[in-house]
Swiss-Prot record:
GO terms for cellular component: small ribosomal subunit. Binds 1 zinc ion per subunit. Part of the 30S ribosomal subunit. Contacts proteins S3 and S10. This is Small ribosomal subunit protein uS14B. Belongs to the universal ribosomal protein uS14 family. Zinc-binding uS14 subfamily. The gene is rpsZ. GO terms for molecular function: rRNA binding; structural constituent of ribosome; zinc ion binding. The keyword Cell membrane does not apply. Zn(2+) binds at C24, C27, C40, C43. It comes from Pediococcus pentosaceus (strain ATCC 25745 / CCUG 21536 / LMG 10740 / 183-1w).
Length: 61
């Protein structure tokens, strides 16, 4: 889990548009966040395995 202070800091409006960065909406993780889902790779994987994300399934080839 991300530090509460950093999550609150990321929610504040940035002074400049280049200072914004993505955080996972579920856990607050700042790295490897998918823009389409607003989730980090770990949360995305967990929700996909639970069937919470429609149309997403585990790939096998």
């Amino acid at each position: 889990m991300a530090k509460k202070s950093l999550v609150v800091k990321s929610e504040r409006p940035a002074k400049f548009s280049t200072q914004t960065y993505t955080r996972c909406e579920r856990c607050g993780r700042p790295h490897s966040v998918y823009r389409k889902f607003h989730l980090c790779r770990i949360c995305l994987r967990e929700l996909a395995h639970e069937g919470q994300i429609p149309g997403m399934k585990k790939a096998s080839w």
